[in-house]
């Protein structure tokens, strides 16, 4: 194939046939008639001719004999697609395997066109994205951000009628961004709406979607089996809950309440104000005090009782407390100190790496399904699932955090059964952290500054049947002044040493402004950075910028123009996709308060000899490795994820100060929020 980048044009305008010109260069695929859908087989030539003047070049498409799609076509083109629904994930696995099985990119292009013309657009986008990420001959391609293909999953439904007007009537150079209000899903009467800026943030929801793209829980072995995948499921979501709780504290709300009683009413309502442009339907809402019901959704082949969740939960608890799981072959597998959390993660989620899905079930995924169908459990009203049913939208819903607080508590039950870290396991003899401070650009020492910022996103690639050219939506999100860590370390070990610098941020007091017990506080520390340091003998000064964080992806990657910010050159481009997975840089630190929210910055230097994973990562994208790992490599830190806060403290340690060893240090700091909006520069 002369230019495999042409594959990316198949993401553009997902409802339009591929024979219509697409992309900035107005290219059209020259498709053999057999690959077209029945609707266009007879009129394909007329459609091509109609757009002939717009078409600047034709992309040749190889004629192949595609395999039958079979049950993949069971999902109607106008339906919504959910990874959490077993039937949907099964057919997704089949389509991914078909794409992975194509012998070269020419065959892949032909097969993708054949499928795209026939299958559900959401299903196609997911399966084609996973295949591109995992095929050796395509994994260097830069797949479009999901918001640019399906902006309807992220933007207020009122935007699209205004966007059509702008696209149809206004010349491209004179179009102005369509501003989305910050408070469009609820009013201040709803206390949970205080943290809507977090739940509905584009970058956070794109992170969740991209993480599940990189770590699918169904499909071929090569797609699902990744190093410490189950443990990463636990850690990434644990950090999401910790971050959410910090935002709640900044907004005078208590910690999120675990969703434990599944037959009780759910007091939190959610009205998403989203429309599906594929289904031409509004996303269903959940009103106050609805209850979960047994599911009888024949169309989705779901027959499941709420009691099944209880059965699966009890069996998982039994495994945790007995220290082993039963495999589907009838054997036992121990939940060991370092490997047990990975086994448990795959069971709880569950992925097809679960050692016994028949016994331990599908707790996390089906929890999403039960909640997402709460408004129509037996399909009597012909309604689709709510936002909890889609990894691209689930984090918008307040109940997502209640459900994941419960899931995290399961993992904490296991972590509580492990031996506590001894001082020897925490200390680094001869290494003392003597000073820590943070400095914002133009701000006071140990003060982090946050504010509102507006950014634009181009919707045109996801707007079918509209005139070409960019149409921008402008939305308001949290951001912060960049800052730097200044850390001084004394090396009295008698030789040069290497260490891993681990930086966390946590709340100084609980929601009642009382001092923490460390066993509770440790669960609210959010990871800010993790990096290797070389320590000479004597005093060392370490300076690190917040933008270098191992947790986040750069701001430009979340709000990128696909054609302007794509990296140039093989290695940079090769890793761009995996790097698309990561916490958004603009949400690295919590909002804070106008008077200043009191936090504690924790810095630790651990012994690199105990952390090191021997492997080459040269040329590899690892800028967001903490939550996402590294592509085709082992997770780059031998320690348990969340170390040193992932286990209960040793005996007689009740406070953070008592927990510290010489290679750790804590610095009090404040996060100050200023209620101002930074507006982007005019485009014209």
Swiss-Prot record:
Glycosylated position list: 80, 352, 356, 486, 491, 545
Superkingdom in the source lineage: Eukaryota
Protein name: Phenoloxidase 1
Enzyme Commission identifier(s): 1.14.18.-
Molecular function in Gene Ontology: metal ion binding; tyrosinase activity
Source organism (scientific name): Holotrichia diomphalia
KW Metal-binding (keyword) present: yes
GO cellular component, one term: extracellular region
Catalytic residues of the enzyme: 349 (proton acceptor)
Chain residues in the propeptide: 1-50
UniProt keyword tRNA-binding, yes or no: no
Residues noted as binding Cu cation A in the record, renumbered to the chain: 208, 212, 237
Example of a GO biological process term: melanin biosynthetic process
Binding site for Cu cation B: 364, 368, 404
Post-translational modification (record): Propeptide cleaved by PPAF1.
Signal peptide: none
Protein location: Secreted
Tissue expr: Hemocytes.
UniProt family annotation: Belongs to the tyrosinase family.
